[in-house]
């Protein structure tokens, strides 16, 4: 999938961003901050669409985790990424200085961790997708509320999301489809392997029964 599919991420306490990371230039940071101001209190997971990108949020215990991704990356991987970041952040700062930290004061400590999580999720999309299905605490992605970002920001004009895109970024949609095809092929081979093993066991059992009844090959 490539790390370019994950554009920007941050951790905030309320509306105060404590740590953030991106390798791109654009207005997505200010758009994400504006969306943070408008998050509904009725749902702890929320996704906004804007100009081929999604702004994904996870709120938990007074903290909000956000990641901006290209739309072709889907919704499962960004939500799984946010769960990973939340778990890591809670282990490091649960009940600690994060509750009183100032804006961007955790950039040096946790900014690099955001980068690591972004890289890992980008490099292991199949593993992340499988884990997100298994974990009980991760609700199905289809349950995440969706809303047009223009409504959230109360603007009449269309928002043009500015992201400094590279050639690699423009090819991410094709990369994502390729990963899906490889995963389907791998699952098909695994399924066939299981069927062949079961078939072999059945044949072996039949031969054992025949040999035991016939005392070898001397059936009359």
From Swiss-Prot:
It comes from the Eukaryota. PROSITE patterns: LONGIN, SYNAPTOBREVIN, V_SNARE. It is found in: Cell membrane; Early endosome membrane. Expressed in flowers, leaves, stems and roots. Residues 130-190 form the v-SNARE coiled-coil homology domain. It is a single-pass type IV membrane protein. Pfam families: Longin, Synaptobrevin. Its main location: membrane. Belongs to the synaptobrevin family. This is Putative vesicle-associated membrane protein 726. It comes from Arabidopsis thaliana (Mouse-ear cress).
């Amino acid at each position: 999938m490539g790390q370019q599919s994950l554009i920007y991420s941050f951790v905030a306490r309320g509306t105060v961003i404590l740590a953030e990371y991106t390798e791109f230039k654009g207005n997505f940071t200010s758009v994400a901050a504006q969306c943070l101001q408008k998050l509904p209190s009725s749902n702890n997971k929320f996704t906004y669409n804007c100009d081929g990108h999604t702004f994904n949020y996870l709120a938990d215990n007074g903290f909000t985790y956000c990641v901006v991704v290209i739309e072709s990356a889907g919704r499962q991987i960004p939500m799984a990424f946010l769960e990973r970041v939340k778990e890591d952040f809670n282990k490091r700062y649960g009940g600690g200085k994060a509750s009183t930290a100032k804006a961007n004061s955790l950039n040096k400590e946790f900014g690099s961790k955001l980068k690591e999580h972004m890289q890992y999720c980008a490099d292991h999309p199949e593993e992340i997708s499988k884990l997100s299905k298994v974990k009980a605490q991760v609700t199905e992605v289809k349950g995440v509320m969706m809303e047009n970002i223009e409504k959230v920001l109360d603007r009449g004009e269309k928002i043009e999301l500015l992201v400094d895109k590279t050639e690699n970024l423009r090819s991410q949609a094709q990369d994502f489809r390729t990963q899906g095809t490889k995963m389907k092929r791998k699952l098909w081979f695994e399924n066939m392997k299981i069927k062949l093993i079961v078939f072999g066991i059945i044949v072996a059992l039949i031969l054992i029964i025949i040999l035991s009844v016939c005392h070898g090959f001397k059936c009359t």
